């Protein structure tokens, strides 16, 4: 384990030398704001994925990263494990394609809302719709 020696990016390219005919697995990383400017201010996490297609076929997510703020996240986890868990779930939902919503009762609201620490009905509806998307085993 330990800190990776290369720069972590949200769009990870294939690494056939390391993973053969598979895409690189999702990477969960601890980063500082200096390493990832997206973690500025109160931002505790960031996620992104790489979506690809075969020709004109559907775009599917094949890999990605979740970055957690190395300076802020441990304190949140110590003070409120449910809040920390909610942050991770929020970022994992971004990883698979959900975007922010305006509804403060949903975990995908852009700001942490006290007491909202798990997926709510709207989040689950969005995840369900994403799960009904096409599968492209050739990728």
Question: Which sequence ranges carry the predicted segments?
Answer:
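Metzincin-family zinc-dependent endopeptidase catalytic domain
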Residues: 1-87
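Metalloprotease/metallohydrolase-associated module, dominated by Zn2+-dependent proteases
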Residues: 49-83, 99-139
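Active-site recognition of the HExxH zinc-binding catalytic motif
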Residues: 86-98
């Amino acid at each position: 384990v330990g800190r990776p020696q290369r720069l972590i990016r949200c769009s990870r390219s294939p690494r056939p030398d390391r993973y053969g005919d598979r895409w690189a697995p999702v990477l969960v990383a601890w980063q500082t704001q200096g390493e990832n400017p997206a973690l500025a201010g109160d931002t505790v996490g960031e996620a992104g994925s790489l979506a690809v297609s075969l020709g004109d076929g559907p775009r599917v997510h094949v890999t990605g990263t979740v970055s957690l703020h190395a300076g802020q996240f441990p304190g949140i986890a110590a003070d409120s494990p449910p809040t920390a868990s909610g942050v991770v779930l929020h970022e994992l939902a971004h990883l698979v394609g959900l975007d922010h919503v305006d509804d403060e009762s949903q975990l995908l609201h852009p700001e942490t809302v006290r007491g909202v620490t798990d997926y709510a009905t709207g989040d689950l509806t969005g995840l369900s719709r994403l799960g009904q998307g096409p599968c492209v085993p050739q990728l």
